[in-house]
Amino acid sequence: MGQRGISLKLAFSLALAGALLAFPADALEWKWSYQGEGVAASGTLITRDRPNADGFYEITGIKGEANGVAIAGLQPPGTSIPGNDGYPVDNLVRTEAPQLSLHGFGYALANGTYANPFYGAHFAKPDTYAFASDPTNHKTSEPAVTFTATIVR
């Protein structure tokens, strides 16, 4: 085997190792989206690979966009997104309806706004809602949304 063959094998091995390290073996990847009045969001969630006793998987990572703005990061569980104090997220999702918990998951957007989709069982019309806040401009919204999430690997 020539030097070129060894270099190609080494490059392939390094690329494969990098891919395996980038996606933990104990994680699942989900495709998710929601749409409602004035909002459309979608992307990828990374969760632990085992559900809790209620069938919920803990979300550990997020990528995507909302209304064309990139998602900058996941809100830590047990904390509230800015502008929604008193409503901490738990970052849980499951395969069966309702797919989100009462606390839902939260994320920051690159433009300084935040979102928290959740299942509002306590609302007059139980449904999935997406609380959105723009702390800089003191604006919030909470439309009902259609949420879907599916495990892809």
What role is predicted for each listed range?
Residues 28-153:
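Mature extracellular "passenger" or substrate-interacting domains of secreted, surface-exposed proteins
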Residues 6, 15, 31-32:
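Generic detector of short alpha-helix boundary/capping microenvironments
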Residues 22-24:
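N-terminal signal peptide c-region/cleavage motif recognized by signal peptidases
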Residues 2-12:
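Bacterial N-terminal signal peptides that target proteins for export
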Residues 11-20:
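Bacterial N-terminal signal peptides
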